[in-house]
């Protein structure tokens, strides 16, 4: 009897250790891989990735500051910095588009460390997620663009572009895209306030929390700029204009502006291998930062207003996404369900 009793503390100790180890596992992660050569094999984290018959040598980085003439997009595996929770992942294209592109999880888990954004057939068979949206030249979901009075345009020309992993903890991570010396294409309708001799500096930080599919987006400018905008694209991108599409939502709520879209399209140009995906996108802009609603052929947009804080001009908003056909248990399977979900989601945002 005494021997059995003495085993209990040992068993309980092992159980406690297992619980502790599980509780320490990260629930968010970041991914930022630069393409290299075999000569980079001594770098920390170096990996050899196989894409069909192609072999790619990569190593992780945390920041890249680049001249705008440099082809950063093609020098990065998955084309930019990325962040993920168990439910969703997002990447930021590192070029003039700076577009947000979503990756949906079929199984709630962290997986970019294994799939590197492009899961092979074996991983797909194990229930891994995948890219779900063809963004083309659109705003995607929650990218920051400029409204020239007729359509959205990319953030250019600039003196410098950068992307980086700002911070990462077990339950939260922040990634950033930034520019320096942006020569804003001002018009009479979008005047620029403040000194602009050296252009405008702007950073956009995207923060993801564990257990969330949404992100908070914080915009910081060296001077106020009228004409900044964000929003959601049409699905497909060459679909009906927002005003003619019943699967669009533009709604003024008591606490801000809610923009959303719903639709079905191929996620990539390879329609032979990939099936169409039904996707819901949304952006919520709190009332102090929500300006006029505008749209062009492929994007439903809201102009951003900013507040001056600590000699900087700041604004924030939120974005979210659902992969209705990709997820095992999606939060919505129809446009009506998606819009209802979003109204509940937006109520708690400020």
Model-derived regions, located:
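Extended, loop-rich substrate-binding clefts of extracytoplasmic carbohydrate-active enzymes
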Residues: 125, 129-211
């Amino acid at each position: 009897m005494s021997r059995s009793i003495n085993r209990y503390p040992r068993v309980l100790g092992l159980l406690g250790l297992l619980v502790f180890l599980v509780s320490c596992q990260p629930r968010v992660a970041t991914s930022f891989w630069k393409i290299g050569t075999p000569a980079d094999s001594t770098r920390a984290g170096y990996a050899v990735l196989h894409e069909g018959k192609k072999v790619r040598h990569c190593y992780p980085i945390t920041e890249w500051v680049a001249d705008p003439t440099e082809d950063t997009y093609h020098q990065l595996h998955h084309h930019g910095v990325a962040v993920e929770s168990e439910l969703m992942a997002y990447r930021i294209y590192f070029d003039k588009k700076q577009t947000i592109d979503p990756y949906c999880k079929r199984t709630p888990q962290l997986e970019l460390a294994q799939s590197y954004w492009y899961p092979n057939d074996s991983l797909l068979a194990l229930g891994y997620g995948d890219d779900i949206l063809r963004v083309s030249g659109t705003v995607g979901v929650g990218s920051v663009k400029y409204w020239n009075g007729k359509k959205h345009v990319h953030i250019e020309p600039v003196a410098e572009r950068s992307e980086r992993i700002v911070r990462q903890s077990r339950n939260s991570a922040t990634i950033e895209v930034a520019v320096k010396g942006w020569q804003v294409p001002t018009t009479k309708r979008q005047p620029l306030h403040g000194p602009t001799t050296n252009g405008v500096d702007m950073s956009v930080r995207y923060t993801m929390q564990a257990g969330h599919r949404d992100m908070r987006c914080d915009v910081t400018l060296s001077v106020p700029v009228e004409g900044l905008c964000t929003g959601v694209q049409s699905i497909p991108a060459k679909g009906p204009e927002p005003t003619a599409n019943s699967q669009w939502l533009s709604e003024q709520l008591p606490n801000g502006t809610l923009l959303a879209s719903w639709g079905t399209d191929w996620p990539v140009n390879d329609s032979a291998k990939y099936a169409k995906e039904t996707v819901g996108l949304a952006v919520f802009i709190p009332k102090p930062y929500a300006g006029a609603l505008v749209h062009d052929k492929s994007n439903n947009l809201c102009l951003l207003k900013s507040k001056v804080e600590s000699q900087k001009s700041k604004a924030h908003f939120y974005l979210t996404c659902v992969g209705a056909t990709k997820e095992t248990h999606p939060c919505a399977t129809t446009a009506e369900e998606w819009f209802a979900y979003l109204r509940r989601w937006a109520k708690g945002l400020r």
